[in-house]
Swiss-Prot record:
Function: Required for aerial hyphae formation. Probably involved in processing the precursor of SapB to its mature form.
Consequence of changing D438A: Partially restores aerial hyphae formation to a ramC deletion
Keywords: ATP-binding, Cell membrane, Kinase, Membrane, Nucleotide-binding, Serine/threonine-protein kinase, Transferase, Transmembrane, Transmembrane helix
Protein name: Probable SapB synthase
Domain of life: Bacteria
Transmembrane regions: 447-467
Effect of disrupting the coding gene: Deletion of ramC leads to loss of aerial hyphae and sporulation on rich or minimal solid medium after 4 days growth. Deletion of the ramC-ramS-ramA-ramB operon on rich medium leads to an initially bald (no aerial hyphae) phenotype; after 4 days develops a substantial aerial mycelium. Wild-type mycelium on minimal medium. No expression of SapB, normal expression of chaplins. A complete chaplin-negative plus ram-negative strain (deletion of ramR or the ramC-ramS-ramA-ramB operon) leads to the complete loss of robust aerial hyphae.
GO cellular component: a single term: plasma membrane
Amino acid sequence: MTAATVRGGTPRDSVVSVSNRWEGAGVNKGYAVYCDADPYFYDAPHRTADRTGAARSRYAAASSPVPEGWQRHESGDWLALRPADADLPAQGWKIHVSACLDNAESVLDRVWRHCVDGGTAFKFVPSRYLLHQRNAKYADRAGSGKFVTVYPADEAEFERLVGELSELLAGEPGPHILSDLRIGDGPVHVRYGGFTRRDCYDADGELRPAVSGPDGVLVPDLRGPVFRIPEWVDPPAFLRPHLDARSAVTVTGMPYTVESALHFSNGGGVYLARDTRTGARVVLKEARPHAGLAADGADAVTRLHRERRALERLSGLACTPEVLDHRTVGEHHFLVLEHIDGKPLNTFFARRHPLIEADPGERRLAEYTDWALDVHARVERAVAEVHARGVVFNDLHLFNIMVRDDDSVALLDFEAAHHVDEAGRQIVANPGFVAPPDRRGVAVDRYALACLRIVLFLPLTSLLAVDRHKAAHLAEVVAEQFPVDRAFLDAAVEEITRVDGSTRVDGSTRADETTRADETTRLDVTTRVHGAPDAARRPAGPVAPVRPDDWPRSRDSMAAAIRASATPSRTDRLFPGDIAQFATAGGGLAFAHGAAGVLYALAESGAGRDEDGEQWLLERTKRPPSGMPLGFHDGLAGLAWTLERLGHRDRALDLAELLLDQPLDHLGPDLHGGTAGLGLALESLAATTGQAALHSAALHCAELAADGLPGGSVPADRVSRGRARAGLLYGGAGRALLFLRLFERTRDSALLDLARDALRQDLARCVRGAGGALQVDEGWRTMPYLGAGSVGIGMVLDDYLAHRADEEFARAANEIVAAAQAMFYAQPGLYRGVAGMVLHLGRTTATAPGTGPRAVRRQLDALSWHAMSYRDRLAFPGEQMMRLSMDLSTGTAGCLLAVASVLGDAPAGLPFLPPPRRSGGPLTRPHQEP
């Protein structure tokens, strides 16, 4: 139940002006598991069974009658059973049992009988599909392998059950659960943690599952991919041999010294190492048995052997690494490969791309085009050489292409490779390169090469998961921006959009025999980015029904798409949005990703109130979800503020009363979920209702938000809690916004001083990049965005400068404008994409060049590059762009609000950041200008 805001970016060693915008080339693997349940929207994985053949994979035990005197509860990925009179502790030692796909049902039947006969509470993953998903290559490593959880009543029963289950399941294979201590070499594991759900805030103000320490104070129950025992817990003596055995297995006996980790997945790690015998650098690829499953069920060890066979067949080619060694340590397998000295293509070409600049010249565009075409030709030749040796690569994408200093290329990661005589489909894939399921053999590689033609110029092919015909639009944009031969792009579009189930093993096709690709029934738990039902068969035409700058048609179209997506029968969410809806209690209601933010955007943009949606929210807030955070973007404060804004004062005040009853000193100081957001909401409610208690609470929030500032009054033991962050949602800018709004209410200049100090803290975490653009430096990447980047700081700087002149701040505000002027941003969203740039450029009072209507129009045009269609209405993709989103933070509602801020008759704005007063009315519609 973490307040998850997914963050991405490229490495900090990239050129500053590049790294902040190229995160679309990176992939947050956590999103993939939310793609199976719906072809258009992210949804909870357990809902997949409602629309696919996954329901047939449900274990018989999941449908068995509830034993007499027992209670049954199914939630998410788990089905729990417990005796009605069970008296379990809140925390303690619990037992996890792992299993493979083939023995899981047998393991479950035995554990079920043992627990029911003994009156022991337990829960289990109820279907083969969900178990496959939990053990997939890029599933959450902290939860990987967990199939059955058993809850002993005390330590004596814990020891007894560990022994009995170990004997009962002796010899059964199962993956090692990384978060647990393994008992012997079987599938039984143990861990100390919470039995019942309790929550506390961690050092960063994030809500986490909790256990209580010896003093009764709740602390985070750490659930990472590493076995940990709380420092106050003494493990039972019978665990000592297993703890010793765990420590005994190391790689010290191998003639390789690990220098750094390059990558982790459920299947194991990839490490940069050095051969101690020769001093040469090598790459170690680790594989864990029964873990890291691909779509075909192959585990990491099976795929490692596939890679070894493929690379040995390709030995001698300059475009593939040599196999140097193969080792086994315990049950872990290691493949030792030649180290290719170069950089992955995603980072290499990002340094060169001209669209990250505000105004690249013709020469710059031409030079980049020549380089990109040369790289594609080299990759195409490399793939042809691989095919000539009888191997299909089957996983070509930017991260698997290494570019050396001389621009020669090498292909990496052959774990999905197979012989050309096998008509194999993709079993692992990058979302931007997922071939349709009708492609087999070398046709998979040809599809990836076609995607690469577009990605080298415009890395937005993840959108093809929703509609493959988006390729034609992307090609048009590329042709408009770069001097590239249109035939080069047309060939890519033809390959991407064709529908041909008759693809032969050698990749040839029969053009006169086309069949519809069934993109909705492929149960693929690794790629999870199948297209929408009409993605392959829809006739060519505009992917988006209207341009964003065609106002008010675009407003009406976006609003219609949002309303068409509503699911009022659901209790967890009304509008589909980011996966964060499922990470926090009440996430589907909250302002950032839930109904509150969407309803706000509809009302503020002039699209009209959604009375049915408001009634849905009122019904769900009669009794807010247990464990819902308190914050503005993620919790109760945002709900209270939104309902007051929409005219539902009684419910707003009910929620405000809940806030007043809660201790707040454990919260972080930020705007997203901390005291800055609470203070702003409470002060706004105080102003509209006249309730003095709300104003007093807002002032208390300001005191807490002053944590760590020179003028703050918070005790020293609370100063500088958590990691330092900058920006509107998580940094000093959000706190400064609270101080500014309270200053406007009280005229207390000390609050203005606090705002100054908070903004200075944020500016101290910024760096200047190419063109003088000021961006937040996170240590390994830089960020220009509205939520966690410099543009959000610029919004608050503008408001501060309205009250007090400051030369340093005025200069910074102008430099931040440059961060909002690039020609390309990887995502469209409000807080992490183009929409935020539109909103800032339309609102800023900075005087730097690039703040006028022309700059806004250019970003509106860039926003159109991401535009999609949902039921023939304008919609936008969410985070990672594998599915559409309707929420405010990442999706269509946020884009609607941003466009309304510059084109609406009554300009819209973010909460607490009102739009500027414009004497001349809305911006001239770009499509109406000469």
